[in-house]
Design a protein with these regions (language model features):
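Alpha/beta-hydrolase superfamily serine-hydrolase fold, recognizing
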Residues: 1-304
Length: 304
């Protein structure tokens, strides 16, 4: 086992306690269908479940958002993003929130990408049974989930990258992506980022063929769909977000970028503020921006 893995796990245990307290203090939005714990791989693993949310009484096909939760690649589950996803569903979307196996032990980064592609593929095949407009599918991810979003978009567009991970085009064409306070570069000198690399890639991380995927600058292309990116005054990944902005400028990729400088209760907005508290004024502002950005990319024709 990597020497720092137990330390990282202890840190995430503390985060789990804080998340549990946060979730217990929040009231779930009402008026929404909540189909929970759908297996996208039938192996009995909690890591291979997803949830689907959409407004009750829906009579037409809705644009789709697929959400990938964050948690430093080693922590998290779809439930920590539940209220965020429900608030997006309130804005007129069908939202699918996915689990994936967490890094550590024998589980590596490529296993996680494989899981996410399995979830995408399941959605592409099965959303026809739900009020989903498969012509208008969007992707969202926060923190490590933002990194996963960048990587999976790149892989979905590139057959050689698909071969690296042993996956195929998933059947979904993402019209736009929301990267919320995303991790972007784990390789440049930065202890907070670098400490994760051996957990994700194993002992041979320096020679791993997956190493390049830990720096979005090595996989980004002009084919990327439009992105919404946000950060905040108290976001510890702010510099990473600005790096992504610079990459989009370099590659002429359409994007909307918002660095939130607002304060709430006299304090700076923190990392993934609109995910952990989608009920706050700033959280709702950011999530409304995401919804509006996605709606601006909606195509008229629907897939059956």
């Amino acid at each position: 086992m990597y020497i720092f893995e137990p330390i990282l796990r202890a840190n995430w245990k503390n985060t789990e306690k804080m998340d549990a307290k946060r979730i217990a203090s929040q009231t779930e939005p009402e008026g929404l269908e909540k189909i929970l714990d759908i297996p996208y791989i039938n192996d009995g693993e909690k890591a291979h479940l997803l949830d689907i949310y959409y407004p009750q009484g829906t009579t037409e096909k809705l644009p789709v958002i697929v959400d990938i939760h964050g948690g430093g690649w080693m922590y998290g589950y779809k439930e920590i993003n539940k209220n965020f996803c429900l608030k997006l569903a309130e804005k007129g979307f069908l939202v699918a929130s996915i689990n994936y196996r967490l890094a550590g032990g024998s589980i590596r980064f490529d296993d996680q990408i494989s899981d996410i592609f399995s979830a995408f593929t399941w959605l592409g095949k099965n959303l026809k049974d739900y009020p989903a407009d498969l012509n208008n599918v969007f992707l969202a991810g926060d923190s490590a989930g933002g990194h996963f979003s960048c990587v999976t978009v790149a892989v979905n567009l590139n057959e050689d990258m698909q071969k690296d991970f042993g996956v195929s085009y998933c059947g979904l064409d993402f019209k736009a992506v929301a990267a919320i306070c995303p991790a972007v570069d784990l390789l440049s000198p930065n202890l907070v980022m670098n400490i994760n690399v051996p957990v994700l890639l194993g002992n041979n991380h320096k020679t791993s063929k997956f190493r390049k995927y830990l720096d979005v600058s090595q996989i980004v292309s002009a084919d990327f769909p439009p992105f919404y990116v946000n950060t905040a005054s108290g976001d510890f990944l702010k510099k990473q977000c600005y790096k992504l902005k610079g990459l989009f400028d370099k590659h002429n990729i359409e994007y909307k970028f918002h660095d939130f400088q607002e304060k709430e209760n006299g304090k700076n907005l923190l990392h993934v503020f609109n995910v952990v508290n989608p009920f706050s004024p700033a959280g709702d502002m950011a999530n409304t921006e995401i919804a509006d950005f996605f709606k601006s990319k909606i195509k008229a024709k629907s897939r059956a």
